[in-house]
Regions:
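Residue-level marker of alpha-helix boundaries and capping positions
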Residues: 8, 162-163, 196, 227, ...
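Short histidine/acidic/glycine/proline-rich micro-motifs that form metal-
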Residues: 36, 190-193, 223-224, 291-292
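A glycine/serine/threonine-rich, flexible loop-to-helix segment
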Residues: 48, 147, 198-206, 267
Length: 354
């Protein structure tokens, strides 16, 4: 039976990955580590409570003793690192937190994995071990009107968030190049789907539209992102963990490029028709000052993972956005819970005064 350390398991992509893996593999043990910051919510894992294949540990990936103890107790076969501060706006206001979690936390995981997996006397790595870093296409910077990011595209991050993720990626490859650690990195485009914290575009807009709140759009709204349904991403991570060539980077994209303003108008139209609510219209859109250093376009070329592992995105945007809206409409209690308290202060600070 394979044993995984899943960090950031209570966040958006991490919790979806936990659900995906438990559904797919009857014989598996997932030790799920999460600090439970604002975006980490145990309600995301409510459906797997009591499953003996799922062990939850609250803690920080920067905690050396905690992580070392987990390696000693469980002898992990895989580490899948989702744990990260991930919102660009928050990184602009407080970059130090992003360095601590995204860079120092990654280095701690790498060091503890090296201590557990490397036999210094024999100068060999234990068989069947792998560290997988879940990263982002934002480490590449921005694109023009055409072209795509490839795995060979130089890293050129523009925000404190993407800089911290690029730094973490470089440490992962340094541990491979220096020590021979078995690693992979996946770099994905913009994810969407269930359990996403409503600071991100799609759940933010769904929630605001439902409550007739203004819809804050940065600049002209023509920033283009490649949208990837989260379950497709989970499938890709599983395939890279179990079949990816050691030391390789794999780009994971959805072939669903859309401008932000298109996304917002799609959500407006969907909810207007479903809820039969005349208060839902494009009049709710409010253009606000653009984000500092806002990248204009991202686009992923996933040819490598398609050719090497046979992965492809199964969910077109037109289907994925319907599934996503359905989920949020059917989980109003979840949304009410995560948007209480500190979220209101954050929202006021981010959008109301612009």
């Amino acid at each position: 039976m394979k044993t995984y350390l899943i960090t950031g398991c209570a966040g958006f992509i991490g919790s979806n990955f936990v659900h995906y893996m438990l559904k797919k593999y009857p014989e598996i043990l997932l030790v799920n580590l999460d600090k439970l910051t604002y975006a980490g919510n145990l309600e995301n894992l409510k459906d797997v409570e009591g499953d003996p294949r799922h062990v939850f540990v609250q803690g920080d990936i920067c905690d050396k003793e905690l992580v070392e103890g987990l390696f000693q107790k469980y002898d992990f076969d895989y580490v899948i690192n989702f744990a990260a501060e991930s919102h660009v706006d928050r990184s602009i206001k407080n970059p130090e937190i992003f360095v601590q979690s995204n860079v120092m936390g990654t280095v701690n995981l790498l060091q503890r994995a090296k201590e557990a997996w490397y036999d210094a006397d024999a100068k060999t790595w234990k068989e069947g071990k792998k560290y997988l870093q879940v990263s982002t296409d934002e480490v590449y910077g921005a694109l023009g009107a055409d072209g795509y990011f490839m795995e060979t595209t130089p890293l050129c991050p523009h925000s404190p968030y993407s800089s911290s993720k690029a730094s973490a990626d470089m440490f992962v490859m340094a541990f491979h190049d220096t020590y021979g650690m078995p690693v992979n990195i996946t770099r994905c485009s913009n994810n969407y789907g269930p359990y996403q914290f409503p600071e991100k575009l799609i759940p933010l807009m769904i929630n605001n539209v439902k409550h007739h709140k203004q819809l804050p759009i940065y600049g002209d709204g023509m920033q283009i992102r490649d949208w990837l349904y989260v379950e497709d991403h989970c499938k890709a991570i599983d395939m890279v963990a179990n079949g990816g060539k050691i030391g390789e980077v794999y780009n994971v994209g959805g072939h669903n490029e859309r401008p932000n303003i298109f996304i917002v108008k799609t959500i407006i139209n969907q909810l207007h028709d479903r809820l039969q609510d005349e208060g839902i219209s494009e009049d709710l859109i409010k253009h606000v000052a653009d984000r500092l250093g806002h990248d204009r376009r991202y686009g992923i070329d996933p040819t490598k993972i398609k050719n090497d592992l046979g992965w492809y995105p199964e969910t077109p945007f037109e289907k994925g956005i319907v599934l996503t809206i359905d989920w949020y409409l059917n989980h109003e209690e979840w949304m009410d819970h995560v948007t209480s308290g500190d979220y209101q202060n954050y929202y006021q600070d981010m959008y109301k005064n612009k």
